[in-house]
Design a protein with these regions (language model features):
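Bacterial N-terminal signal peptides
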Residues: 7-18
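Positively charged n-region of N-terminal signal peptides that target proteins for export
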Residues: 1-6
């Protein structure tokens, strides 16, 4: 009863979070740590169901320097730019069968069928009391289901986990004929048919063969495209995970290894976890890295980039970007540290506050003619009159903003006066472009200048 009351309190608090926006570019969410994103399209919106990394609280008694995850949020967007946090949808304290002290709510999934939304999640079950003591092993992961009438909840966890399934990383594929398949991992990748009730398996799980046998294999995400079934999965080929895929003509295989989608992260992040969807004619890869926690890869952040298929159905390798996806409104505070391209020298990106990475980044221009390009800025009807820049510099400096190329039309020239603290400098816009354009921000003279954001108002 104590845990149930706490769970209701959490959901009540979450209701106040529904108007809290997240931000665009990569990472997608910057006010908390998020990982393992499953992206789905429901009711004309994209919903992302990630896991939620947190700093270990005092009561955490698990493995040191490990993944600490106590609940799930869901985020939605109708434009790939502005992400809305709908708050907590499931918590370890609100699942009857789960250990409320395990902090092991790992990668989830959510699907829609017959008027209901089914949220699948792994968790450690409560001990049965027979295996206790200092040398006791904790129970193995199980996969639970929570059900809702809407994609953002409230979700009601079922009283017990799916029987006959032991593992993590649940993923559900609903085939064209309505049959649902549950994929999950435990050293290997398994698949099982689900009964029409979506909460029980129909028959025994089977191992998917013909996948890599050396190195960790986990995190399945399956989808169908033009008659081909794609099984994507993280795999440790060397020291850390990269994202690979296999294909089949059947959702249960046999699958054939087909290639690499995403190379090992340059950050050294040990894990990767993925989902792929099509939105308005473009495919996207959702994944995670450690952008907001460069020194600790158990506090991760979700990202997204465009993904492309070749004419033969093979997947082109994705190159991670800072800029990410979606349009950015010219009136917003444009984070140019998430640039699309930069000059060969004179540009450094660092945290605004090294003690608080969630405060975001700044861009330092330290050489004449150093520049950054930021693509896909939406100027709308072109009514912006002023350019504002939040910056600071030890000596006066000048920034020029051009349209579409370094020698393109000059939008404005902003003089940054000497200031040791952040201040907003302004200049009159010389042009009022309409529609979507790239902008190029160039330091033309003066001392090194740190820029937090710029905006067209």
């Amino acid at each position: 009863m104590k845990h149930s009351l706490r769970y209701l309190l959490i959901l009540s608090v979450a209701s106040f979070l529904k108007t809290s926006p997240a931000f665009a570019t990569n990472p997608l969410i910057t006010d908390q740590f998020t990982a393992d994103p499953t992206a789905r399209i429901f009711d004309g919106k994209i919903y992302v169901y990630p896991s939620h990394d947190i700093k270990a609280p005092p009561e955490y008694k698990g493995k040191p320097d490990w993944f600490v995850m106590e609940d799930y949020h869901v985020f939605s967007s109708n434009n790939l730019t502005d992400w809305k946090d709908h708050g907590i949808i499931v918590s370890q304290t609100g699942v009857d069968w789960a250990d409320p002290t395990a902090y092991a709510m790992w990668a989830p999934d959510c699907v829609f069928k017959d008027g209901k939304y089914y949220f699948y999640f792994p968790a450690i079950p409560k001990s049965d009391g027979e295996n206790e003591g200092p040398d006791a092993k904790r129970p193995e992961f199980r996969i639970g289901v929570a059900v809702s009438d809407t994609p953002y909840g409230p979700f009601k966890p079922l009283p017990t986990y799916i029987q006959g399934v032991t593992g993590i990383d649940p993923n559900v594929l609903i085939d064209k004929d309505g049959t649902a398949y549950l994929y999950y991992s435990l050293g290997k990748i398994f698949v099982a048919k689900l009964k029409p009730n979506m909460t029980e398996i129909d028959g025994e799980p089977m191992v998917i063969d013909n996948l890599p046998t050396k190195g960790l294999l986990e995190g399945p995400f399956a989808f169908e495209r033009k008659g081909t079934y794609y099984l994507t999965y993280p795999h440790v080929e060397n020291k850390i995970e990269r994202l690979e895929y296999a294909t089949s003509t059947s959702p249960m295989g046999p699958f054939k290894q087909a290639g690499v989608i995403l190379d090992e992260s340059e950050s050294g992040c040990w894990t990767v976890h993925q989902s792929i969807l099509d939105w308005q004619g473009q495919s996207y890869l959702f994944y995670h890295d450690q952008d907001l926690s460069p020194a600790f890869d158990k506090n991760r952040s979700i990202r997204a980039d465009k993904l492309f298929f070749n004419t033969d159905g093979s997947i082109q390798k994705v190159k991670p970007t800072l800029r990410g996806i979606g349009l950015v409104n010219a009136k917003s505070e444009i984070q140019i540290d998430r640039y699309s391209a930069k000059s060969a020298g004179g540009i450094v990106v660092s945290f605004n506050d090294e003690a608080n990475p969630l405060a975001g980044w700044k861009t330092t221009f330290s050489a004449a003619n150093s520049w950054v390009r930021f693509n896909d800025v939406d100027f709308g009807r072109g009514k912006q009159k002023t350019i504002k820049v939040r910056a600071k510099t030890g000596a006066s400096s000048t920034l020029e903003i051009h349209l579409d190329s370094e020698d393109g039309p000059l939008l404005g020239r902003v003089k940054i006066g000497e200031a040791t603290d952040w201040k907003i400098s302004s200049a009159t816009a010389k042009k009022n472009p309409k529609g979507v354009h790239d902008i190029i921000v160039t330091q033309t003279d003066g001392g090194a200048v740190e820029v937090d954001w710029l905006s067209f108002r």
